[in-house]
Regions:
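Canonical P-loop GTPase G-domain recognition
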Residues: 73-126, 130-133, 284-285, 311-385, ...
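Long, well-ordered amphipathic alpha-helical subdomains in the mid-to-C-terminal portions
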Residues: 371-421
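Flexible beta-alpha connector loops of hexameric P-loop NTPases
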Residues: 30-34, 92-97, 136-137, 197-199, ...
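Conserved Switch II/interswitch segment of TRAFAC-class P-loop GTPases
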Residues: 27-35, 57-64, 233-236, 251-273, ...
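N-terminal accessory targeting/assembly segments
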Residues: 1-81, 85, 436
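Intrinsically disordered, low-complexity proline-rich regions
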Residues: 288, 293-295, 300-302, 307-309, ...
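Conserved G1/Walker A P-loop phosphate-binding module
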Residues: 117-255
Length: 436
């Protein structure tokens, strides 16, 4: 419970609200009218009066009725966790795409709460006895919001199509995505691996837009690495749905780097939160069995799949335990972690940190990425008839061509080729030799 309230306090701080007190109540089930019991509401009124507070944040989602009744009973502004997160996203959105995604989520959250929001407007206008809008005005606003939601969904579908076309046009390099709980250090990891001067901030949801960089992983290999928006406990469904075009980068990636804040006391729960969201996206099947010893992937042999969700392609997942410089005993931590994640990488992006383990740290992660790139894009010599210009052009488009030599009516192309493409070439009768 304390950890949950700590995180809610962090969200409040990120949103610009100062926390002056906290309380909780254990209940078997929330009451339909106030969520809390009447006695707790009276206690909360006393705490608010004593502290002079004008805002109450709830860690749990409130129904429109509960929110309205609580505000009447407490005579202060009431926000649930979802509304706080939406507010943070609204202030952090920078790109046109992120702003559309946030606006869509906000409107879908607002629609069933429109009457309550009008009550706030009446208060702001300040007149005693000032009546709220009539039913005609409310219905007009509802129709306008529904139209706007429809427009935003169409625009975001266009964005998703555009992203998909972009990905199809850049399959020459292996693709990887940084995923993880918010503030785990994903952006810092991209900055450290790429060497670029990227914006990094030690705050929740510092990054909302995807950012992609080509990373040199050594041995002549490069990986196209994408930073994605962070996840959080009880991430609003509206946001998951609205940010689907952005999160699709993780779905489309051939490799996932799950960045974990090793110093956080609840890191295991944070891992579970991230994997649950990935299940919603179809990257994992529900069932939560063992992690695969070779890659940290879930055993997806049990559990139902979400309706309408395509069977996900199993991906290699590298578990990256970051912020190792904040651990009191990195050796003991690594020993514990490797019982469940045998190939885990322990890192720190802090410039002054030293990871006292061979193969660890950012450079250790780079070598792990190199091995993955070699598996995803093996070097192959492919013999293509000179007349098959279409296939030669496709190899240049979808592979990293290293050399091309024409001998006796055959073009021998040496390239780093997507592993699954090699099988298709062999099925077409094309001679393929893998370089070891």
């Amino acid at each position: 419970m304390d950890a949950h309230l700590d995180e809610l306090g962090q969200l409040a701080d990120t949103a610009g609200a100062g926390v002056v007190g906290r309380t909780y109540q254990r209940i078997e089930a929330p009451t339909p009218n106030l969520y809390l019991g009447q006695g707790k509401v009276e206690e909360l009124k006393g705490l608010l009066l004593k502290a002079g507070s004008t805002l109450v944040l709830f860690d749990e989602p409130l129904s429109p009725v509960q929110g309205t009744n609580l505000e009447r009973a407490l005579a202060v502004r009431v926000m649930d966790r979802t509304e706080v997160i939406l507010d943070i996203f609204a202030t952090r959105a920078r790109s046109a795409e992120a702003k559309m995604q946030v606006e869509l989520a906000q409107l879908e959250y607002l629609l069933p709460r429109l009457t309550r929001m009008w009550t706030h407007l009446s208060r702001i206008r300040g007149g005693i006895g000032l009546r709220g809008p009539g039913e005609t005005q409310l219905e007009t606003d509802r129709r306008a919001i529904r139209r706007k939601i429809s427009v935003l969904k169409k625009r975001l579908e266009d964005v998703a199509d555009h992203r998909a076309n972009q990905r199809r046009g850049r399959r020459d390099l292996p693709s990887a995505a940084l995923i993880g709980y918010t503030n785990a250090g994903k952006s810092s990891m991209l900055k450290a691996l790429s060497g670029d001067d990227l914006f990094v901030e030690d705050r929740l949801f510092a990054t909302l837009d995807t950012l992609t960089r080509e990373v040199d992983v050594g041995g002549g290999y490069r990986v196209r690495l994408t930073d994605t928006v962070g996840f959080i406990r009880k991430l609003p469904h509206h946001l998951v749905a609205s940010f689907r075009a952005t999160l699709e980068e993780a779905r489309a990636a051939e490799l996932l780097l799950h960045v974990i804040d090793a110093s956080h006391p609840a890191w295991e729960h944070q891992v579970e939160v991230v994997e649950n969201v990935l299940e919603e996206m179809g990257l994992y099947e529900p069932g939560g069995g063992k992690r695969d010893a070779g890659s940290g992937k879930r055993d997806a042999r049990s559990g139902k799949r979400d309706a309408g969700c395509e069977r996900p392609e199993r991906k290699r997942v590298i578990y990256v335990f970051n912020k190792a410089d904040l651990l009191p005993d990195p050796d003991a931590f690594l020993e514990h972690v490797r019982e469940h994640y045998p190939h885990a990488v322990l890192t720190s992006t802090h410039p002054a940190s030293r990871i006292p383990h061979p193969g660890m740290g950012v450079e250790g992660l780079r070598s792990v990425l190199r091995a993955s790139a070699q598996a995803l894009r093996p070097v192959a010599r492919i013999q293509v008839p000179v007349a098959d210009g279409k296939l030669i052009a496709a190899l240049h488009r979808d592979s990293e061509v290293m050399s091309e030599v024409q001998v006796d009516g055959v073009v021998e192309v040496t390239a780093r080729v997507e592993a699954r493409l090699l099988g298709k070439l062999r099925q077409q009768g094309i001679t393929v030799e893998i370089s070891v």
